[in-house]
Amino acid sequence: MKEKVEFEQVIERGCGLDVHKETVTATIKGEGIKQETREFSTYTRSLISLRDWLLKNGITHVAMESTGVYWKPVFNILGEHFQIILVNARHVKNVPGRKTDQLDSQWLAKLLMAGLLKASFIPIKKIRELKDLVRYKTKLTRQVSSEKNRFVKILEDANIKLSSVLTDIFCVTGMKMIREIIECDYDPDKLLYHVHGSVKKSRSEIKEAITGYVTDHHRFMMQTILESIEKTEDIIAKIDSQIAEQTKEYGLEIELLETIPGVGHDGAIGIISEVGADMSVFPDEKHIAKWAGMCPGNNETAGKKKSSRASYGNAYIRALLVQLAWSASRTKKTYLSSKYKSLVRRMGKKKAIVAVGHKILIASYFIIKDKVAYNELGEEYLSNFRKDKLVAYYKKMLQELEPNLEFETKVA
């Protein structure tokens, strides 16, 4: 007769939730209660009924998958009353071919009771609100860049090569010329009056670039795109004001993070918005690197370790760290820039930049945890480190050949 395999129970009473946009399927089980599965809607009143049902049955722990934003309304209602364990859906997949809402909630409850679930990081409310602001600002900033690129295409369609003679067509000189093209009769000679003396290109070359064929359609498109850019930049300014208000209590952490080469003020706020200011939620620096997806995955078979891609993690913090790593790689006479140059020869640009991003994350972890500024090692650190290791290696080899061999210590 086949024996039934059960997990050892480590939690007294728990609940597994299968969360969707419109429904929540809940399964409770544990000591002194009968396993039961119920379905609730995601409206607030129904979620309150779910909360009351769980409290009535003495539930202490609740597990649910981090499915998009659908878990947030549930967390808002249950968060103050139960220990919520938010889990990655990839980590709790059931047996293929056996998937229903009821079975999923029962499987989550079973794993929860056995203590087999790894909880995802849920920042405090203030950090979650700051994260919303920073992510929205990032999206709007990209939208502005997209609109500016579209504007350049309209100019190109009108045979105006303004981007070939100005580094930034949205500078003071460029905007004066653009406004005149939109609002006045198009005349290349008159446009030259707006050219500032600091522009490197000659006036004859500039005139050649701005001589084109402008139609009413081009004027309409340019005006509409400019209005879109201005409106979006106004919204970004409002968000910046709100971010400044939200980050007042994190002033010290932001100031210290700015000491990392390539990070800057916006980068420091971005890091705080994703990881928070309490590093006790991460047992050590390896855990935060794993959570962010900034460390290699494990790929070992038959005792051999094979190369593997970086692990899955927080896509937003990963993108931010890569962006900051590019900035750090362009700094002068810094450890991070020399590290990038050292790695890029054997790894290639993409892997090298992820490695530098990993360094920035680890530095950020200790800076926030210990409230200390970044310790700049300098561009010579790596070469000196390799030199010292090489000297130590040759000393060891020589002493193996001649145990009584002594070395003189050179005094600088």
Name each model-derived stretch.
Residues 1-412:
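A detector of single, family-specific signature residues
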